[in-house]
Amino acid sequence: NIRETFNQALDNLSRDNTLNELGKGFNARQRVRGNLDASNINLQIGFKTIRPNSSASKNGMPIYSNVSRREIFDLYEKYSGQRPDFRNIPNKGQLSSTTITSGPWKGTTIILRNFSTSREQTGAKWTIEFRNQPASIRGQRLELKFR
């Protein structure tokens, strides 16, 4: 169906633009006293701009406060194109992952999880992680953490 193909192409373009903006934010991180400062990586959910907690976002990963579970799931869908489909990871928690199959972010896996090895330090309840991001994006690990 031509309409479905067109709508899918628009969705993919929107996703790619959103991910490209996020990538620009990660690339713009500056070193402050030896650490990457991620306090300027803002997120857009609908008409709402979410800013990271500036004092907590000094280790290279932005940490956001006061973001609802629904908003986190909406962000995951915005980045991946799919609603979370969780599977239980024994002794850890829940995890949902999607791999992008087209466009400049092809091969990038987006993971939503409610566990983290840094939970004690960050207080994060949810993490959106990006693996195998395009080579143009600086950094080994790209994560968004939510308290």
Where are these regions (language model features)?
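Catalytic toxin/effector domains delivered as secreted proteins or via bacterial secretion systems
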Residues: 2-147
